[in-house]
Each structure stands twice: as C-alpha cells, then as structure tokens.
C-alpha cells in the first residue's frame, strides 16, 4: 500500500476524461498512499473554493463519495481534506456543508484489513463526528468559531449576554467533540493521522481562545445578570474549568509529539476564590437580599459614578450609565449599578490580540486613580499586571474583606477586594486575579521580583520552562504561526503548575506592557446593555422559568442550541441588531433574541433555530409577559422580510407562540428527531409576507398589532384569492372540525383569477373528472390515463384533503406564486401540507424546508403539493421537488367546458 494503487490512477483518469479537474484533485488527495494529502492538491482545492464557477456541491459530493471507500487510508484522507477545506477554503464550502442534512455517516466504519485498519477506524469515527459537529455549529451560529476575531473586541467578547448564554453550549459541544479524538503519542504512527492531529490541534487553540473570550465576557457581565442567567453562566463556568483540564492533556500530547513549545499555550487555573465569589453572588440573588451582595459597605473605587448602595438588585441596572461609568470591578459589591462597559481593561482571561497602542502610558496606567485603574479586576491575562507589580507596594489588600488569614506564598488573595478603599488595593488585585495570566504575580508575602523587561534575580527551574513557552510566537496571530507578536505576548503562557512560589516572569523583550485601556466601540456597548437592561421587563417570567432554563442549559451541548429560551427581547429599536449582524447577513440576523414565552410549553423549540431562521424566535409574546410585542425586530430589512418576527397582539394564547416559532421555517433543521410535534394553531399574519420585504416594518411601523387575523392580500398580488391562506379570526386556534372545507367552500375559494386552476377545482368538486371517457371525440388525447399512475394519482375525494390555501395535487401552481406553505403550515391541513407533516409520518416539521437554502433565496421551489411523508433534501435537484404533474400536461386539456356547465 505504499504508492498509489491502480484504482487510484483509474479514478483520476476517469475524472480527467470527463473534464472535472476538481474531482480529479480530490481523487489525487485521497489516494491509497499512507501519507497525508499532498499540499499541491490541497492548495488546488482551496483555490477552487474561491473560484465563482466551481461547483462546491460537486466537490463536497466527491469527498463524501471517497469517504465511503472501504480502505481506512482513503476515508481518513477524505476527512483530512474536508477539514482542511473547512479551515482554509472559502467560507462557501463550510456554508454548504452546514446546509446539508447529512455529512459523514461513519459512526460504524470499520476497516478489517489488518490491525492497523482496526486502530485507525476508531479515529476515523471520532474525527468524522467532530467534522459533523463543526458544520452543525456553523449552521447554528452562522459563523465558524475558529475563523472569527478573538481578543478584546472579538466576537465572543462583545456578544450580548442573551446570545452568549446560547452560544457557549454550542462552542462547548464542538470542543467536546474535538477532545474525544483522544489520541496518544504512540498512536500517531503514520502521516494520515498526523495530518488530522495537526488540524485538530490548530482548531483547538482557536476554539479555546473563543471559549476563553466567552467566559471573560460572562464573568464581566455576571453581576448584572438576572438570577436565571447567573445560574446558566455559573454552570457554563464550571464546565469551562473541567474542559480546561482536558484541553491541557490534549496539549501535552501535542508537546510530546514534537509540536513547537512556542505554539502550545500554558493554561493556569483561576483561583478557586473566583468560583466562591460567583456562587456567593448567586446565593444572594436567590436569597432575594437587596443591596450589597458581598456584604461590604464601601463602594468600589471604580464605581464612583453609581455607588453600590443605590442599587437594590442587579435587575435594575440603569441603561444610561453604560457609556459614562468606567468598567466596574467584577468583584464589586453588587455594584451592577455601574455596568461593565465592554472596554478592554475589564478583564482578559487570555488577551489574544493585544493592542499595541499607547504602550508608553501603560506602565503608569494601573496606578492612576479610579479611571486609570480601569484594569480593575484586571486584564486577567494581560501583561500590564506585571508593571503594576513593580510600581505598587505589596501591602495592598488592606481592606480586603474576603482576604484569608496570612497564607503561604502559593495562595493568591481572594479577588474580592473590589471594595478596597485604596487604589493600590485595586492594582494589587489586578496582579493576582490573573485567571490564566502570565502574571507570575507575587503574593502579599513577597516583594515584587522584577519590573517588566528586566531580568529576574533568581528564576526557579520551572519558571524557565514557562519562559520558554513565552518566547514562542503567538498562536492566535491572524496568520498560521506568524511570529509578529512580541514575545511576551504569548497569551496562553502561564504559571507552570510546579512553581511553589509565583514569580514575576522576566521576558527577553523590553517592550512596555500592553496598557489595555482602549475602549471598544461605544455602539457595541450600548447594544449590549440594551439587551441586558431591558431584559428586566420580563423578570417575572424569568423568575418562574429559571429552573426550566437551567435544565435546558444543562442538556447535552450538541442539542442545547439556545439554552435559555426565556430571555426577553430587547425593546430598543434595532439596537442589538447591528451588533449581532452588522451586514444584514442572511444567516441569523435575529435568531437569538427571543421574547419570553413564560410557561409556554415549548422548551424544545430551542432546538429549532437554524442557520437561516432569520427571526425564528421572535414569536409573539404570550399574555403572561410584560414586554410589548417585538416591534423593533423589523428594524433591519431581513432577507426574509422579517417573516417570522410577528407583531401580533399580545393577547394571543400561548399555543399561538408555539406555532409561529416552531413552525416558522427552520430551513435547515433535520438533525435529531427531538423536535416538538406540530400544533394545529393558525399562523400569525406576519408570516404571510415570507418573501416580501415589509417596508412598514423597516420604518418602524409594525403592521396592525390589534388582531392576528388582519391579513394583507397584497402579499399575494395578482394571484387573486387562489393562494390566500385561510386565516382564523382574532388569533383563535382553529378547531380541527373547521379545517377541511366543504366542497362548496372549496369551489368558491377556487374561483380565482387563474381560469385553469378554477376549472380544476370545479372538476374536483363536481366529481365528474371521469366523464370524459364517455366522449368518443376526446379519446385520442388519452387524458384520463395520465392521471392514474404513481405520483400523479389523484383521489376522487380531493376537496376534503386540501384547504383553500394549497392548490390541488393535480394542478401546477402559477410560476409566479409564493408557495403558500413556505413560511408556515396552512391551517390545520390534514393531508399533504407543506409545513406540517400528516399524523403518522415520522417527518420532522422542518424536513421540507431545507429545499430553500441551496437555491437563490427569492426563488423557492414549489413544495405545496408534497406527498405525505416525502422527505425533501436541500440539494436543488429535480428529484427533490415534490412529485406533481409536469407543466406540459394540462389536466384540463382533454375536458370540454360544456361538460360541466
């Protein structure tokens, strides 16, 4: 098996003959040679993903086809090639993979061709699961965690808490799938698995950086959150600590395999006192004690603009203070009153992309009173803590109410000294709370060892190892392994576990410390608070449902797509949207801001927001909540015209919310069978304009919110009432008995502006579709025979099985029509509906929607007449269209109108 086999050459030659250079390159990259895919073939494929005329689905299909080979070498190389393209190729590639319902189905793969095949098959199964998870998380988030910006103004650091709480479990699931690869150094025995391991290693570094940013963001905002959110955040933080241990083990394997130490970050655990502080805060919230949750009366030096004593509960955080008050110390007494702005100083667990501006001012910054001491609880990984050490005497934690008794130097003081009355206390905390920092900070018992850039008087042996780690390049620099970052900025370089006493790390470079005082853009900060602070409107709902929220968050991460379903929608018009999707991207502009549904029985609907469900969760709030109907969701002209952000009245019953949120088009769902059963409630009117960019909505005037039966016929311009969905009056759920219209009703509905369709419905209603066989002069057309076979079979009782909103199964909808079921199920339709599966079929509610993804967005396929149980796949091939009569065969061509006049 050393070289290419004959079959490899034949396959490549076949594709050469057919002229498919891309498929040929895929074959060349996945030969039977036991070595990683050759760089020239990978580069060719990467270049191909950037070409506009290359068929990405065909490339992916060829890779999937190679992954069905019986040889572990070919399969493994197909996986490595796919992973390489997901990471380095154009985003169109991973976007397409995310749109597919199935990717690699290798959970049972086994190559029995030798002991090596058995061993490698195990890793193939794990690796394929990770790649599936990677595509799935892209589908849910609409971005790739490994590609997004990291650091102080990165995506995870600036994300609003509601969205953050939903994103973190998705990220945790992806990291878990990666860690399950679980390889030992002695198993990395060939070039194929080595190539896979290198890709996984690089992914893990980027994913963990994102994870770290998310945790920093959570901790910054922890003291402003409501009780339910605090519970979720604490749970996420606990999981983070356990995953850190597993990540460290993975990185040890990488080190043993010979990956450059400079590329491997050192991880240091946060002090346990941090966890205690968080738990104490949560207990205070649950105990409903107002005021200072930490029990210290002195306001934090940083929160002078709004003293802690004025705040009764974190829920009442004033929205106005976000821009003016300096970042609050995260351990401040409940002073959520001074909301933590998203300025960089407020904490860097792993400051991944440090900014180099203002370096000269940085050395003095930490000693400046409150505003300058904005590093408060500190750039948790920021190097400025070292500078702080050199300039501040170490008797700092004088008034630290939580400081333990004098302890051996190994213990760090509790970071709760936010209430310290002196600035020095604050700065000292900066040095000690380095959750993961390089800050080998001196404990209270020892003098600062050295200033930034100098050499330490005595460096213990373990520290030398850490220095070695420091001197490498920055693993998070934008380009792979680029060495542009200053050596001391390897931001994962941390305290080695062996050190008995923390010591300041001397670094070879004399670059000044990063000041970490550049504030990130104000709009982001405003958007973030808009989302957090206005959430108080639904505090009552959250209180009653926080238990449910907690269970959702604790579910397996792969399914816990949007953990806390009960966050209330922001009320500031369109403020959070630019934050979530600045470029009106077609994936998920508002998929994460859901109005609270109170006790509405839909916890699983959190599973259904998908890549394209633009506003899937902006369903109308039930009457139990205090927040108004979501008017602001229309502020952005979504690609689907905000089809699902309905402005229906608040008095709708809770089932209404269920229907509109769950049924509203998770265009890409299809993973897992755990989606909820459809309810037969009517659809809110806002869903009728599925593809109409609602201009009233865009300018802030939500269409009539008074009654949910107000329906704008102009949505179906030019189609008469033929395709108009049946709307039940005033938002009442339609009783099942009124669903199948009588033949007379269907006939009257059918008399639209389209003569052919009207006549077709008359034929169905009058039941004389068979009469033409009596006419001898029409026999040459053989019309009736065309209606009898297979997919074209048409029952005589059709009037009872299709409601007025869906054309009869024998007719072809007009080419200009919007499929009436594309956005929602037609009302209670028992038979061949588009949005709702008939009872008894295993089809999930969303199964027929994915057809819309891989095609141009404004040209949905006709799915209206789908046969019950048909599972549509997202690839836009004719085979996936619902079986119906070809346009050429007019069902009325052989009928004489005189027959039924």
Swiss-Prot record:
Stretches the record annotates as Disordered: 285-326, 397-424, 497-522, 573-606, 803-845, 857-901
Residues in ENTH domain copies: 14-145
Membrane topology term: Peripheral membrane protein
Residues bearing PTM Asymmetric dimethylarginine: 859
PTM characteristics: Thr-310 can be modified by the addition of N-acetylglucosamine which can be further phosphorylated. There is no evidence for direct Thr-310 phosphorylation.
Tissue: Brain. Associated with the synapses.
InterPro entries: ANTH_dom (IPR011417), ANTH_dom_sf (IPR014712), AP180-like (IPR045192), ENTH (IPR013809), ENTH_VHS (IPR008942)
Subcellular localization(s) per the UniProt record: Cell membrane; Membrane, Coated pit
GO BP annotations, alphabetical order: chemical synaptic transmission; clathrin coat assembly; clathrin-dependent endocytosis; neurotransmitter secretion; protein transport; regulation of clathrin-dependent endocytosis
Low complexity bias locations: 410-424, 500-511, 835-845
Residues carrying covalently attached carbohydrate according to the record: 310
Bias type Pro residues, positions: 512-522
Main location: membrane
Notes on the domains: Possesses a three domain structure: the N-terminal 300 residues harbor a clathrin binding site, an acidic middle domain 450 residues, interrupted by an Ala-rich segment, and the C-terminal domain (166 residues).
Function: Adaptins are components of the adaptor complexes which link clathrin to receptors in coated vesicles. Clathrin-associated protein complexes are believed to interact with the cytoplasmic tails of membrane proteins, leading to their selection and concentration. Binding of AP180 to clathrin triskelia induces their assembly into 60-70 nm coats.
Record-given protein name: Clathrin coat assembly protein AP180
